[in-house]
């Protein structure tokens, strides 16, 4: 399944899947949903082998950092509830006010809420072609985790 709140993003996803259908032998099993991801995860009956969470920035300013952390925690907790044992979760943040340590702690809190055992397979950050300046540490805002969920 592909889920995005943007109908345009879903239309582009469907178009790309059609263009690349030779790489998707079970294309008929794919479904796209233009819906809020929180709503989808809370109501979805399926359990998934792989989930990729790549939301837009939840916070661009310090005054909304707490709300962003709560959003990341809720989103990841719902994903942990919907992933099969042995599944892989890719989770990302591009909120510059939520640093890597806070993001990792928030994802850990989500795993605790969902009562799932989780192992970090990879810590991810922005590639070298998007390197931040040493004089602007806030430029290091892209972060992610690849997690194995028991």
Residues covered by each model-derived region:
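Conserved SAM-binding motif I beta-strand of class I
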Residues: 1-4
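Short beta->alpha junction loops/turns
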Residues: 6, 37, 68, 95-96
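S-adenosyl-L-methionine
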Residues: 6-52
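Flexible loop/turn segments at secondary-structure boundaries
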Residues: 8-10, 39-41, 59-61, 97-100, ...
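Generic hydrophobic alpha-helical scaffold/packing signal
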Residues: 10, 14, 18, 38-45, ...
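Mobile active-site "lid"/loop adjacent to the S-adenosyl-L-methionine
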Residues: 48-78
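Helix-to-beta-strand junctions that scaffold the AdoMet/dcAdoMet cofactor pocket
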Residues: 83-85
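C-terminal catalytic and target-recognition region of SAM-dependent MTase-like enzymes
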Residues: 88-150
């Amino acid at each position: 399944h592909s889920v995005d709140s943007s109908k345009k993003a879903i239309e582009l996803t469907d178009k790309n899947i059609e263009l690349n259908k030779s790489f998707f032998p079970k294309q008929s099993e794919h479904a796209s949903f233009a819906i809020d991801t929180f709503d989808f995860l809370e109501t979805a009956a399926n359990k998934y082998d792989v989930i990729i969470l790549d939301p837009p920035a939840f916070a661009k300013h310090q005054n909304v950092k707490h709300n962003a952390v709560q959003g990341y925690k809720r989103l990841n907790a719902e994903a942990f509830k919907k992933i099969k044992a042995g599944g892989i979760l890719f989770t990302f943040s591009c909120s510059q006010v939520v640093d890597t340590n806070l993001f990792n702690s928030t994802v850990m809190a989500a795993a605790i809420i969902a009562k799932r055992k989780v192992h970090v397979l990879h810590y991810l950050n922005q590639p070298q072609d998007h390197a931040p300046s040493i004089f602007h540490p806030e430029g290091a805002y892209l972060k992610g985790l690849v997690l194995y969920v028991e």
